From Swiss-Prot:
The active site is at H103, D106. HAMAP family: Xylose_isom_A. This is Xylose isomerase. The gene is xylA. The keyword Membrane does not apply. Its EC number is 5.3.1.5. GO terms for biological process: D-xylose metabolic process. It is an enzyme of class 5 (isomerase). NCBIfam families: PRK05474.1, xylose_isom_A. It comes from Levilactobacillus brevis (Lactobacillus brevis). Its cofactor is Mg(2+).
């Protein structure tokens, strides 16, 4: 039996609206409760991010790490890596989640060669697979870290150096093999350094062609080895590069269509990345779902006062409600999607239990958002609003426009003699402030029950 790492923490339970002083517990996330015919746990499919939860030391550009973790006593890199697996699976069991996500380099230290690195990684993956057999834990997605090591200083697939491209492809090959071993439901590509610092010395077309080339290689090899995962691209506009090629959902979808990737790839969308691109999280989810390309979600939030990616645990109920309304409209997050907490505690929240507290607020916030979104959907509130707003397209000239019967000549004949007073009279106030007030009341009323 392994040692207990998270001492003093019992399995987190649904406690409802009890006083928070009663201890750790979920107020809104009740995994077995049915919402619109589906269990909450199946709507949300929560996952824990290995990197932020078990590897993140809470460093910032101005100070060393503050994190206190129960496995800090291990100094040998491989001993530490194996101890983290024990701690991680205890954490999953106590938190009550079914999924994890990881980069290859989250799990094990690198060696001098890729062969040595793969051997280290395989030892840790062996242990994860054994835990999966006894715990039932599943992998929502895995991926390759091709941005941290100095060899990726100018990108991986988009590097100007062929040796780096070759190394990246070899690393990716092994990561796909690991994905098959652990039964990963998705495989994510986040191009951490797939972009440029300056256009003056950049062949942008060649770099994007190389990125598409490695994505096709990945899908081809996954098919070859029987790794049936949904491939996902994750947009982010900047940081660490000045400009990244997968800027936002719309840009990434255009890239996918340009290079014939949209049949095999979907999108993994993150809240903080949406903010950096100048969008709301809801906007990015809407763009993806209406294109039929919503794959999975990373759950976190940014700060409008801070211009970088802070990966804060989500707590804004208005934002989680908006995100979950898009999910409810879609019928699910995606064919195999989930909500991965790509989030970390603040540097001042350094105690081990803060990892539980952060996940609890995130899980409760999205569960609350689901409850409110379902209430609005079941009442038909927003559906009725939109149906009324666009009702002019149900008959007359509007119906002709919708059906394709109208053309420029027929529309000119219809509009050319209409006085401005008649056109203005056809418009109506949308009472947007009332809509926002009503949404506020849905949040307050639904969550007070």
């Amino acid at each position: 039996m392994t040692e207990e790492y998270w001492k003093g923490v019992d399995k987190i339970q649904y406690v409802g609206h009890q006083d928070k002083k009663s201890g750790l517990g979920f107020q809104y996330y009740n995994p077995e409760e049915e919402i619109m015919g589906k269990k909450m746990k199946d709507w949300l499919r929560f996952a824990v991010a290995y990197w932020h939860t078990f590897d993140q030391r809470l460093v910032d550009p101005f100070g060393d790490g503050t994190a206190q973790r129960p496995y800090d006593k291990y100094t040998d890199p491989m001993d530490l890596a194996l101890a983290k697996v024990d701690a991680a699976f205890e954490f999953y069991q106590k938190l009550g989640v079914d999924y994890l996500c990881f980069h290859d380099r989250d799990l094990a230290p690198e060696g001098d060669t890729l062969r040595e690195t793969n051997a280290n990684l395989d030892k840790v993956v062996d242990k994860i697979v054994e835990y999966q057999k006894t715990s039932g834990m599943k992998v929502l997605w895995n991926t390759s870290n091709m941005f941290t090591n100095p060899r990726f200083v100018e990108g991986a697939a988009t590097s100007p150096y062929a040796d780096v491209f070759a190394y990246s492809a070899a690393q990716l090959k092994h990561s796909l093999e690991i994905g098959k071993r652990v039964g990963s439901e998705n495989y994510v590509f986040w191009g951490g350094r797939e972009g440029y610092e300056s256009l003056w010395n950049t062949n942008m077309k060649q770099e994007q062609e190389h990125a598409a080339k490695i994505f096709h290689m990945a899908k081809d090899y996954a098919n070859e080895i029987g790794f049936d995962a949904q491939m996902l691209l994750e947009p982010k506009p900047k940081e660490p590069t000045t400009h990244q090629y997968d800027f936002d959902a719309a840009t990434t979808i255009a890239f996918m269509k340009e290079y014939d990737l949209d049949k095999d790839f979907k999108l993994n969308l993150e809240g903080n990345h949406a903010n950096l691109a100048g969008h709301t999280y809801q906007h990015e989810i809407r763009v993806a779902r209406e294109a039929g390309l919503l794959g999975s979600l990373d759950a976190n939030q940014g700060d409008k006062l801070i211009g970088w990616d802070i990966d804060e645990y989500p707590s804004n109920l208005y934002e989680t409600t908006a995100a979950m309304y898009e999910v409810v409209e879609n019928g699910s997050i995606g064919p195999r999607g989930g909500l991965n907490f790509d989030a970390k505690p603040r540097r001042s929240a350094f105690a081990p239990e803060d990892l539980f507290l952060g996940h609890i607020v995130g899980m409760d916030s999205f569960a609350a958002g689901l409850r409110v979104a379902a209430a609005m959907k079941q009442d038909g509130f927003l559906d009725n609003l939109k149906a009324d707003r666009y009702s002019s397209y149900k008959s007359g000239v509007g119906a002709d426009i919708e059906s394709g019967k109208a053309d420029l000549k027929s529309l000119e004949a219809y509009a050319i003699d209409k006085p401005q007073s008649e056109l203005i009279a056809a418009t109506h106030s949308d009472h947007l402030e009332e809509i926002k007030d009503t949404i506020n009341h849905y949040i307050i009323d639904t969550l007070s029950k």
